[in-house]
Amino acid sequence: VTAPGPDLHTNAVRCLSSWRTADPGQEALRQAFLGFLAAKADACHRSCEAGHLTASALVLDATGERTLLTLHPRVGRWLQLGGHCEPEDTDLVSAALREATEESGITGLRIDPRPLHLDVHEVTCSLGVPTRHFDVRFLVRAPVAAREVLSAESLDLRWFPLAALPADVDSVPTMVSLAMTRAAGAAEAGSAGPVVPG
């Protein structure tokens, strides 16, 4: 399997270095992610057994009232869309957008290039080796009348109202809260915020 190129590592450092968060826990994780990137030239490769960066997307519908979650086959729980970086990914934003597009089947997704949330968790990847995912989550908006298409990577794919999320959804409620705060700030500023079209 071809590994992601050096540009991905460089751009991951740039992305996390330029992002600021007022949350002390998230700031500690940001520093930890940057430290991991500094220590591991292959930090974005799934072959890095100590752990590797992954990219996720909290996908909201055009109204901002529902989020699209996948019933993950390995984890057995509803999660946000996302996954490993691939050779064609030049940065974490493109990786998150690619994963969201592949797993949702929706074209025309738009992504905010600023990280929304960071999380590190222990997993056993497809290689069968226990490792850690240093997950960088982004906010993605679906176009009006978007129709999702179930892929082989999901057991199920479903829109959930933000006020009625399923039980045991990991940190999805935290991400939803952060997304709402960001949307409110953008509305006050009279802008939808920066977006990158898919």
Give names to the regions the model predicted:
Residues 79-87:
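Short helix/strand-bridging catalytic loops that position acidic/His residues to coordinate divalent metals
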Residues 86-175:
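Unchanged
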Residues 45-80:
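N-terminal strand-loop-strand
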Residues 2-19, 131, 144-198:
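Nudix hydrolase/Nudix homology domain
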Residues 20-56:
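Acidic, metal-coordinating catalytic segment for phosphate/diphosphate chemistry
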Residues 1-26, 93-111:
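Short N-terminal secondary-structure initiator segments
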Residues 39, 48, 73, 80, ...:
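Residue-level signal for pocket-adjacent positions within structured domains
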